Curated annotation (Swiss-Prot):
PANTHER family: 50S/60S RIBOSOMAL PROTEIN L16, LARGE RIBOSOMAL SUBUNIT PROTEIN UL16M. It comes from Helicobacter pylori (strain J99 / ATCC 700824) (Campylobacter pylori J99). GO terms for molecular function: rRNA binding; structural constituent of ribosome; tRNA binding. The gene is rplP. Part of the 50S ribosomal subunit. HAMAP family: Ribosomal_uL16 (MF_01342). SUPFAM superfamilies: Ribosomal protein L16p/L10e (SSF54686). GO terms for cellular component: cytosolic large ribosomal subunit. PROSITE patterns: RIBOSOMAL_L16_1, RIBOSOMAL_L16_2. This is Large ribosomal subunit protein uL16. One of its GO terms (biological process) is translation. Binds 23S rRNA and is also seen to make contacts with the A and possibly P site tRNAs. Keywords: Ribonucleoprotein, Ribosomal protein, RNA-binding, rRNA-binding, tRNA-binding. InterPro entries: Ribosomal_uL16, Ribosomal_uL16_bact-type, Ribosomal_uL16_CS, Ribosomal_uL16_dom, Ribosomal_uL16_sf. Pfam families: Ribosomal_L16. The lineage of its organism: Bacteria, Pseudomonadati, Campylobacterota, Epsilonproteobacteria, Campylobacterales.
Length: 141
């Protein structure tokens, strides 16, 4: 499960997820990748389930990079609890995703097999994504 080792503060405010990704929006390590095309929030379990689906399909060949890390705590109060009495405890760790953000990258895998593996992992993600290559990366999302 991905989460920070330690943080300065235990809980954060919700914040707003607006605009396009200015960082992490280009392929840096691999030659084919998944790029987000809408706003969303991804938690550590979704990151891991998409990674497992991808690596099982490619049978451990090549290399996969996870370009996102959940560093924002999401709190929740227990069920059937009255309002008040402070903010709830940390339930899970998430990351806000903006359009244009690269989520996963692959290298050293035949393009057809890589596209199939990335398509499997796309279904595990809670926002719309598209598969991009180094050549098609500069297209408008």
């Amino acid at each position: 499960m991905l989460m920070p080792k330690r943080t300065k503060y235990r809980k954060q405010m919700k914040g707003r997820n607006r605009g396009k990704a200015h960082r992490g929006n280009s392929i840096a390590f691999g030659d084919i990748a998944i790029k987000a095309i809408e706003h969303g929030r991804i938690d550590s379990r979704q990151i891991e389930s998409a990674r497992v689906a991808m690596t099982r399909h490619i049978k451990r060949a090549g290399k996969v990079w996870i370009r996102v890390f959940p560093d924002k705590p999401l709190t929740a109060k227990p069920l059937e609890t009255r309002m008040g009495k402070g903010k709830g405890s940390v339930e899970k760790w998430v990351m806000n995703i903006k359009p244009g953000r690269i989520v996963y990258e692959m290298l050293g895998i035949e393009e057809g097999l890589a596209r199939e593996a990335l398509a499997l992992s796309q279904s595990k993600l809670p926002f719309k994504t598209k598969i991009v290559t180094c050549e098609s990366e500069n297209e408008i999302y």
